[in-house]
């Protein structure tokens, strides 16, 4: 039973701990409000070494130094945007985890929606297209013709 | 009577559309592959600092190997700035070339000892040779981030006005040197 309890505890811990943060206690700013801002900024910045992690999550040494720099800028009174701009000036848009909308990234941002719209239109066209041609009732003349044909089924009518 | 023969062209187009799309994709992928073969690494980040002045740095020297490296040392003539560290394996592979460049003594080659213990840097230089004119210590990546460095080694060509004109990512090979960097230095001197 004890083993079972321990196993469930470990499983739960693994399930809960989906994101880990790399910020070490000695890196944190004393002011919780400034630290919170630094965390928010860090989550928008890409670790340029590992490229798929934020600097907030990454244990790479360069990410650690970038976190330190972010905190220095925040302490110096920079706005969040100013800190991001500072990094973009050095690394380009590449450093942002959420790419800005520019001529180069417009396809990235809106391409999926355009494709979805296109797909939706195609589907809509298929749905609207009548699958069974509606049969119109025969006119009295046609009825008479059918009547004549069925009565005289052996005779071929060329008209 | 008219059913089925109304829009023959549209039907044909729908039929060949997938083939056209596949061919377009093949063309895009093929171009990418050819780019990589030609040495264009899509993962490589083009520096936004090209053709901008070198960042403001004022780095302390390694112990008893003064002076350090500051922005004003990168003005007045064409210089090379190499980011390295004793921990950097790839730096060792380009080191013989840097030694040769230093031996020719035609261009100042400055080093930034990135994220390194000063004593470790000095030991590494004692063991492998010291090609650098000035060396600045950058223990907290301040200069590295200012230069937009993503890994070591990286080498910058700075013109006489102190403007970054070229960035080389990774170890410099003999081909890089003779075909790209040396001609650029020559051109910048004129």
PLM segments and residue spans:
Chain B
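Aromatic-flanked redox-active Cys/Sec active sites in thiol-based oxidoreductases
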Residues: 82-88, 114
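Structural microenvironment flanking redox-active thiols in thiol-disulfide oxidoreductases
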Residues: 92-129, 138-145
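A generic structural signal for alpha->beta connector loops
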Residues: 51, 56, 106-107, 131-132
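Hydrophobic beta-strand anchors of alpha/beta hydrolase catalytic cores
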Residues: 80-81, 109, 155
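Thiol/disulfide oxidoreductase modules built on the thioredoxin-like
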Residues: 126-131, 138-189
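A short beta-strand-turn-helix
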Residues: 57-80
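Short gly/ser/thr-rich secondary-structure transition/capping motifs
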Residues: 37-40, 60-66, 135-138
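N-terminal targeting signals for export/organelle localization
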Residues: 1-60, 190
């Amino acid at each position: 039973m004890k083993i079972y309890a321990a196993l469930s505890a470990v499983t739960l811990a693994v399930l809960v701990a989906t994101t880990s943060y790399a910020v070490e206690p000695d890196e944190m700013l004393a002011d919780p409000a400034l630290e919170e801002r630094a965390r928010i900024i860090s989550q928008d910045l890409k670790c340029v070494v590992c490229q798929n992690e934020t600097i907030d999550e990454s244990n790479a040494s360069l990410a650690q130094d970038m976190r330190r720099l972010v905190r220095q800028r925040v302490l110096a009174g920079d706005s969040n945007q100013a800190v991001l701009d500072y990094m973009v000036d050095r690394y380009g848009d590449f450093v942002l985890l959420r790419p800005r909308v520019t001529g180069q990234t417009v396809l990235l941002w809106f391409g999926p929606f355009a494709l979805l719209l296109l797909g939706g239109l195609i589907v809509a066209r298929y749905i609207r297209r009548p699958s069974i041609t509606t049969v119109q009732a025969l006119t009295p003349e046609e009825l008479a013709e059918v009547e004549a044909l069925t009565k005289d089924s052996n005779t071929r009518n060329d008209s | 009577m008219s059913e089925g023969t109304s829009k023959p062209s549209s039907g044909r187009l729908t039929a060949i559309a997938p083939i056209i799309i596949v061919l377009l994709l093949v063309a895009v992928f093929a171009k990418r592959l050819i780019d990589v073969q030609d040495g264009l690494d899509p993962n490589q980040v083009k520096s936004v600092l090209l053709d901008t002045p070198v960042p403001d740095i004022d780095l302390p020297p390694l112990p008893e190997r003064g002076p350090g490296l500051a922005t004003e040392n990168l003005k007045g003539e064409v210089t090379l700035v190499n980011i390295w560290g004793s921990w950097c394996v790839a730096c060792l592979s380009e080191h013989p070339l840097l030694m040769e460049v230093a031996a020719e003594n035609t261009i100042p080659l400055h080093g930034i000892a990135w994220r390194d213990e000063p004593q470790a840097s000095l030991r590494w230089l004692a063991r492998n040779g010291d090609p650098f004119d000035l060396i600045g210590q950058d223990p907290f990546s301040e200069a590295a981030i200012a230069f937009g460095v993503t890994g070591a080694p990286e080498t910058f060509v700075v013109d006489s006005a102190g403007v970054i004109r070229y960035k080389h990512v990774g170890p410099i090979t003999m081909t890089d040197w003779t075909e790209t960097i040396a001609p650029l230095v020559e051109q910048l001197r004129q």
